[in-house]
C-alpha cells in the first residue's frame, strides 16, 4: 500500500513508556512501541517524535512548587525520555538524532529547523526533547510547533484510547466516538483532544491531527498508509 503521508510528527506520552504502571521505563512496552515506529520507518516515511515526561514528572502534581520550576523539571524529563527512545530505536537498527530545545551540548544538539530536516531527509528519526524550552506550554503544543516547523503532513497523537469521544469512554459506556472532527468543534466543545494552544496552532496552520490507540503499535504503520485507525481532526 502506498504512503498517504511522507513526513509525520508523532507524539508519544511519557506514561505510555511506563507500561501499565505509567512510571519509569517498562522494557516490553518500550520494545513494542519502538518496534511499531520501526515498521513505519521501514515504509519510507520521514518521522519526527516528541515524547512527554509524565512517567517521571507531572507538573500539575507538583504541589506548591512554583509553576515555572515545575515545568522546567518536566522539560528535563522529556529529554531523558527522548534519549531512552533514541537508544531503543538504535538497538533495533533505526538511525536517530536527538535535538533539545534547552542548550545542553554534552547531551544533544540544540534544535534548529535546518538540522532537523536534514536528519529526517537522511532517513534518521528526529526526536525532540525539552518541550518548547519555555514553561506553561504542553508537549502537545511542542508537537504541533515542531510539526509546523518541519512542514509535517500530519501530527499523530498516540494515546491510550482509540480516538476522540464526546465523553470519557472509560467512565461512560454510551460514549460516542468521532471518526472525523473539525478544530472548530474541538475548541468550541472543549473536547479532550489536546489543549487549546496546540489545537489553535494546528488549525491556523492547516495541520491535521490523527488520534489513535498506541496499545497496538502497528497502528503507526497503518496510519501512515491511510488506514482508518482513529479520529482525524482537520479544519473543514
Report each predicted region and the residues it spans.
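C-terminal catalytic "cap/lid" subdomain
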Residues: 1-236
Amino acid at each position: 500500500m502506498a504512503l498517504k503521508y511522507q513526513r509525520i510528527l508523532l507524539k508519544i506520552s511519557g506514561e505510555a513508556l511506563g507500561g501499565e504502571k505509567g512510571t519509569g521505563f517498562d522494557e516490553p512496552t518500550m520494545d513494542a512501541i519502538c518496534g511499531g515506529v520501526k515498521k513505519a520507518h521501514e515504509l519510507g516515511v520521514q518521522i519526527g517524535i516528541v515524547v512527554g515526561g509524565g512517567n517521571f514528572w507531572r507538573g500539575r502534581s507538583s504541589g506548591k512548587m512554583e509553576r515555572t520550576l515545575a515545568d522546567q523539571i518536566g522539560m528535563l524529563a522529556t529529554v531523558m525520555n527522548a534519549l531512552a527512545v533514541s537508544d531503543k530505536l538504535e538497538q533495533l537498527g533505526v538511525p536517530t538524532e536527538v535535538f533539545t530545545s534547552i542548550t545542553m551540548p554534552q547531551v544533544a544538539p540544540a534544535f534548529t529547523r535546518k538540522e532537523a530536516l536534514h536528519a529526517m531527509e537522511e532517513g534518521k528519526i528526529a526526536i525532540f526533547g525539552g518541550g518548547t524550552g519555555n514553561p506553561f506550554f504542553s508537549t502537545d503544543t511542542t508537537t504541533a510547533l515542531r510539526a509546523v516547523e518541519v512542514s509535517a503532513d500530519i501530527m499523530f497523537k498516540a494515546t491510550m484510547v482509540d480516538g476522540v469521544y464526546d465523553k470519557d469512554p472509560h467512565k461512560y459506556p454510551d460514549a460516542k466516538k468521532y471518526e472525523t472532527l473539525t478544530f472548530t468543534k474541538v475548541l468550541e466543545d472543549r473536547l479532550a483532544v489536546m489543549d487549546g494552544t496546540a489545537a489553535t496552532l494546528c488549525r491556523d496552520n492547516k495541520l491535521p491531527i490523527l488520534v489513535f490507540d498506541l496499545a497496538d503499535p502497528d497502528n503507526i504503520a497503518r496510519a501512515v498508509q491511510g488506514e482508518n485507525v482513529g479520529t482525524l481532526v482537520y479544519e473543514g
